[in-house]
Regions:
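A structural signal for short loop-to-beta-strand junctions that line the ligand-binding cleft
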Residues: 79-80, 108-143, 174, 282-283, ...
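Glycine-centered hinge/linker elements that transmit conformational signals in sensory
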Residues: 163-166, 205-235
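Extracytoplasmic "Venus flytrap"/periplasmic binding protein-like
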Residues: 26, 45-113, 120, 146-148, ...
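Extracytoplasmic/periplasmic solute-binding protein
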Residues: 126-130, 135, 158-208, 251
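Short, solvent-exposed loop/beta-turn-alpha elements that line the ligand-binding surface or hinge
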Residues: 99-113, 176-183, 197-218, 266, ...
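Hinge/lid segment of periplasmic solute-binding proteins
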Residues: 86-136, 158-161, 189, 269-273, ...
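Conserved C-terminal helix/tail region of periplasmic/extracytoplasmic solute-binding proteins
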Residues: 48, 145, 228, 351-401
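C-terminal lobe and pocket-closing loops
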Residues: 90, 258-271, 278-374
């Protein structure tokens, strides 16, 4: 009998019916369509540390990556981890699709003010913060001067509008780039103005919707007014598409993040200034993060958690922030002497961190986007008064909280 078992074993082995030990794979989705060098360096180090483990890092464009990650998880075939907008975390957590993460007290103390609030819900942390941005206004001085004005920072919405109108009326360019496409960063553009006018979307502690306010009505009215001196067809543009218009000299100014300077043509003489203040507020900015979530029930959940932690740890995170041109997500000056964000240019993006407003955390984040974008498109199309459109949007937001 013993010899029979041995013979059968050898027969199966010879026929190739006994599978070799399978190499382990960690599947990762990276929103944005590319794997950046800083992240790839960490992935390579992770694979070198774990012999036989490979990371399937799949780069997926922003337009589809979040839905893909969520659909796979809901279907019972989750990826190990995904880099995605932190706005998705509340829905993923409450649906039981991701697991909470542990960030050491030491690392928590390194983050910029407000960062951990963007990844927390119900007393738990649901993602490792991995990208952070604040915003500022980029102005093409050549077009401003061609329009007969001095290229100095407008401090108020009135000053910004007057500058944009002068460019629009006296040059071949539109005065300002306005985003109104049904896209997440259209909502983000609007929130930069809202937070510069003393407005808010909701009370983060109580959940009360505060969007229906005089400050929001003023902001929506101003957004519609800007559309009158903006590029043709704002509803066809999201923020990323405005960069090309700016490079082509077709718009005089637009709001972008600190990576903007690296995307702009060298021959553009520009200034970068704080977002002008509205009549009811002070200059502000949206504080927005993307993060790495670890999905529940993947084949190698522990490995996915380790990789997520490595990608977002001190030196690795610094390399990403510096090379990508991101607002520093951590207070790196506590870790090292020579940091990249000490210039006057970076001051415009770093100084507002303490007073900026967060991207709201809604369980139905698509309702948040739909409600705000509907109001933006409505004011541009003349479908109602700002007050009515804001009230309608607030009702949509209440359903998504």
């Amino acid at each position: 009998m013993k010899n029979l078992k041995k013979a059968l074993f050898l027969a199966f082995l010879g026929a190739g019916l006994i599978a070799p030990v399978q190499a382990e794979e960690v599947h990762m989705i990276m929103c944005g369509g590319e794997i950046r060098e800083a992240d790839q360096a960490v992935i390579s180090a992770f694979e070198a540390k774990h012999s036989g483990v490979t990371v399937n890092a799949e780069a997926v464009p922003w337009g589809t990556c979040q839905d893909k990650s969520m659909t796979l998880a809901a279907a019972g075939d989750p990826v190990g981890l995904a880099y995605m907008g932190s706005r998705t975390l509340k829905q993923l957590a409450r649906s039981g699709l991701i697991v909470p993460v542990d960030i050491s007290d030491e690392q928590q103390g390194m983050y910029q003010p407000g960062i951990l609030n963007t990844v927390s819900d119900g007393g738990k942390t649901w993602g490792f913060p991995h990208a952070f941005s604040t915003k500022a206004l980029f102005i093409n001085c050549g077009l401003v001067e061609e329009a007969g004005m001095a290229c100095v920072a407008p401090k108020t919405w009135t000053g910004m509008y007057n500058m944009a109108k002068a460019i629009n009326d006296n040059t071949a360019a539109a005065g300002v780039g306005v985003a109104a496409k049904d896209f997440d960063n259209t909502m983000h553009q609007f929130l930069n103005y809202l937070y510069s006018n003393g407005g808010s979307v909701n009370n983060a502690e109580t959940g009360e919707i505060t969007f229906n306010s005089p400050e929001t009505v003023e902001t929506l009215e101003f957004y519609g007014k800007l559309a009158g001196v903006a590029q043709e067809g704002p509803m066809g543009y999201e923020r990323g598409q405005l960069t090309q218009l700016y490079n082509d000299g077709q718009i005089g100014m637009y709001i972008n993040g600190p990576w903007g300077a690296g995307q702009h043509n060298d021959n553009i003489a520009e200034i970068v200034v704080p977002i002008p203040a509205g009549p009811s507020g002070e200059s502000g900015t949206l504080l927005i993060t993307d993060s790495i979530a670890v999905f529940k029930g993947s084949a190698n959940e522990d490995l996915a958690m380790e990789l997520a932690s490595m990608l977002s740890s001190g030196e690795a995170q610094y390399d990403l922030d510096m090379s990508w041109g991101l607002t520093p997500i951590m207070q790196y000056e506590k870790m090292m002497d020579d940091v990249y964000y000490t210039t006057d240019y970076w001051k415009v993006f770093v100084d507002p961190i303490g007073s900026g407003g967060p991207e709201p955390m809604f369980e139905d984040f698509k309702a948040l986007q739909a409600g705000i974008n509907s109001a933006i498109q409505g004011i541009i199309l003349g479908e109602g008064s700002a007050a009515d459109l804001v009230a309608e949007a607030a009702e949509t937001l209440a359903e998504g909280l």
